[in-house]
C-alpha cells in the first residue's frame, strides 16, 4: 500500500455522515461577511470563505472505529493514521492504526506501531494484546517461517507483561482481562506445536470467562486438533448455546457434527450459520464442507464457490473440498487447479497433498497422467505424516 500524506481535512465529506453515527465534530468557525466597499444595494459583496478549524484526533479515532467495526479496514487505516499524525501520543490512534495494519497484512509496520504504543503507554493492556497478535499474524503469514521463528517467543514475552497488567487491574475487570491473556497465550502455544499446554491455557481462560464463545471455539478447535472429537463437539455446542447468533461457532459445530457422522444434525446447523452471515466466507464455506460430507455435491459446490469468491486467500480448506468435488466428477483439470491452490495456501496438510498427487496419478480424456508429479506429492505427504497409509499405497503404485 502506498504511503499517504494526510492533512487535517482528510475525508471531510465522509466525516459529516460517518461521525454522525459516532460523535459530532466540533463546529466550524462562523463565516464572516465582508462589508461592501461602497453603497450598492443591488450588488452585495460575496461573503469571505469560512475558516475550517482542524479536526481533533479523537474525531478521526471515532471514524476509524466506525470503519473498523464495519470491516472497512482500508478506510479505518486512513482515519487512524490521520489521528496519529495529528496526535502522535494518542494511544487510541496508535492502537487502531496497529490493528488496521494487521488486518491489511502490513505486519512489520503494525509491530512498529504497537511497540511505540506499549513503549509510551506501558500500562495499556489492549496494546500488549494487539502486539502479541501482530507477532502471531506475521508468523502465520510468512512465506519462510524460519525467518520469523523469534516472533512466538516475543509474543509470549509481551503476554507475560500483559498478565502482570491484568493482575493489577481493578477486581471487577481482573477475570475478564486475565481470560484475554490466557486465550492469546493458548493461540501462541498452538502455533508452537505445544498442544497440551495450549489446551490448558484455553481451559484456564474459559474458567475465568465461562460464557465467552470465542474461548470455547478455540478450546474445541484444540480438542479436535488432538483427536478428541467428543470434547471438541461439546465445547462448540457450549459456544453455540452461549452465543446463538455467532455464525463462526455454529458453522464449526456443524462441521464437527458432520465429521462425527451425524450429518442429519449437521446440515441444518450449517445452513443456519450461512443464513446468519451470508457474506461470511467461513460460514458459507463450512456449509459447503458439511454438504460435501452429507453427499450433497450440488449445494457443496455452490457454497464453496461462493466462499472462495468472498475471500480467495483465507480458507484453503475450501479449495481442497472443491478439488475433491472435481475429482469425484472426473474433472481432473479443475481438480488439479483447486488442489494446487489448497496446497499452496496450506501446504502442511498431508491429506491435501495426497489428493493432489492422486489427481496427477489419474488421467481422463485429454488430461494425461503425470506419474512424476504424483510421486513427488505422495513423497511430500509422507514426509509430513510417515504413517499416512493412502500416501504410501499411492507411492507404491507410481514407482
Regions found by a protein language model. Name each.
Residues 47-52, 126, 161-179, 308:
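Flexible helix-coil transition and linker loops at the boundaries of alpha-helical arrays
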Residues 54, 88, 122, 167, ...:
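Short coil turns that delineate tetratricopeptide repeat
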Residues 55-86, 103, 180, 184-192:
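Alpha-helical segment of the N-proximal tetratricopeptide repeat
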Residues 57-58, 91-92, 125-126, 170-172, ...:
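Helix-start (N-cap) detector for alpha-helical repeat units in TPR-like alpha-solenoids
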Residues 62, 96, 130, 177, ...:
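Canonical tetratricopeptide repeat
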Residues 71-82, 103-116, 140-161, 191-204, ...:
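Structural signature of tandem alpha-helical TPR/SEL1-like repeats
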